[in-house]
Amino acid sequence: MSLVRLAHELPIEAPRTAWLDSIIKGDCVSALERLPDHSVDVIFADPPYNLQLGGDLHRPDQSMVSAVDDHWDQFESFQAYDAFTRAWLLACRRVLKPNGTIWVIGSYHNIFRVGTQLQDLGFWLLNDIVWRKTNPMPNFRGRRFQNAHETLIWASREQKGKGYTFNYEAMKAANDDVQMRSDWLFPICTGSERLKDENGDKVHPTQKPEALLARIMMASSKPGDVILDPFFGSGTTGAVAKRLGRHFVGIEREQPYIDAATARINAVEPLGKAELTVMTGKRAEPRVAFTSVMEAGLLRPGTVLCDERRRFAAIVRADGTLTANGEAGSIHRIGARVQGFDACNGWTFWHFEENGVLKPIDALRKIIREQMAAAGA
C-alpha cells in the first residue's frame, strides 16, 4: 500500500485525511506547512547532528568505519545549522497541540544548540533523557572518552502547557514498580532489526532502535494519538506507532529512505486493543466531589461515618460536609482534625456501614466514576 504523499501536491493546512498515516515527501519545513495548526499530539525529531567530520575514520586494522557523511548532515556553519533548527522547530510548534510534547534526540555535536533554540522559542523543558548504549562504537583514535550515549530533550509546547500526557503509573509498573529514571539503557540498532539494502549495506546510518521509540510513545502518548516525525528516515517512528495503535505522519525527502520505510510499515501488524490498554493511576481518574455521592443517593444526611477501627465518628450533613466534636468541614479536614494530623485522605479514612460491614466511602466514589465512564464523561 502506498503511504507517500508529495508535499507540493498537498494544500496548505490540508485536512487530516490527506496526511494521516502517511509519509510526506519533501523538505520538512515546507511539508509542515501542509499540516493544520494544533494537529499533532507528540513530535519525535531526530534531526541532522551536524557531525562536522573532517575525513575518513579507520579502525586499528585500517578498515574504514561507516560513519555519517551524507549530504543532509552537512552545514556551512553553526549559524546555518541554528537557522535551520529554528525554522523546523517553529514549524513544529505551530502544528503541536497546546497540550502536546516534543522529543528531540541528538549527540554532543548538536543537542545543546537545539536545546537553546527550544527554550528561545518558548518550549518548556520537562526532562533530558540519557540513552546509554549497551554496545557503542569504540573511540578508535584514543584521544577522548568513548562516546556511549545520546541525549533526548522532552519538552511541552509552552510553560503553561498543562494536561500533557505522561503515563507515570505505566512507566513505574514496567520498571518493577520503581520510578523510571532519566537514564535509559538500550543497544544500538543491530541484527535483524537493522534495515539493509540488496548489497548488505545499512539503509540509513542512524536508524534508531524500536525499543527506544516504543518507550517514548508508551510514556507520552495514548492509543489514537498522532505522532509526527519531521525527519522520518527509515520509518522507525511509523512502524512503532502502527504497532502501538497510534497514528503517524512522517516527513522525508530521500526516496531510498521512503521506499524502505514504506515496506517496513506495511509489514507491521498492530497490537490488539487489550494489549494497548495503558495503566493509569489515581491522578488520571476524574475528580469526584463528596456531594456527588450524596446527590446520587449513595449516602444520606445524618449518616454516621467512622474510621475502620471505630475510634472516631462524624455525621454527614446535607451540604456535603462532616461534623465532629462541634466542628464542621470537608471529609479530609475533619478526618485530619479528629486524629490531630495536618492532612488526611478522607476517602480512605472514613467508612460507612452496610449490612454490618464497614466499607470505605472511596467505594462509593468508585461507583460514581463508573457511572461517569458509562455516560462518556
Swiss-Prot record:
Entry keywords, A to Z: DNA replication, DNA-binding, Methyltransferase, S-adenosyl-L-methionine, Transferase
Top enzyme category: transferase
EC number assigned by the record: 2.1.1.72
GO biological process: DNA replication; methylation
Phenotype upon gene inactivation: Essential, it cannot be disrupted.
Catalytic activity annotation: a 2'-deoxyadenosine in DNA + S-adenosyl-L-methionine = an N(6)-methyl-2'-deoxyadenosine in DNA + S-adenosyl-L-homocysteine + H(+)
Induction (free text): By CtrA.
Matches recorded under InterPro entries: DNA_methylase_N4/N6 (IPR002941), DNA_methylase_N6_adenine_CS (IPR002052), RAMA (IPR040843), RM_Methyltransferase (IPR001091), SAM-dependent_MTases_sf (IPR029063)
Family statement drawn from the similarity comment of this UniProt entry: Belongs to the N(4)/N(6)-methyltransferase family.
Function as written in the Swiss-Prot or TrEMBL entry: Overexpression from a moderate-copy number plasmid (10-12 copies/cell) leads to enlarged, branched cells, many with 3-5 genome equivalents. Contributes to the accurate cell-cycle control of DNA replication and cellular morphology.
The protein, known as: DNA methyltransferase CcrM
Organism, as annotated: Brucella abortus (strain 2308)
Gene (name only): ccrM
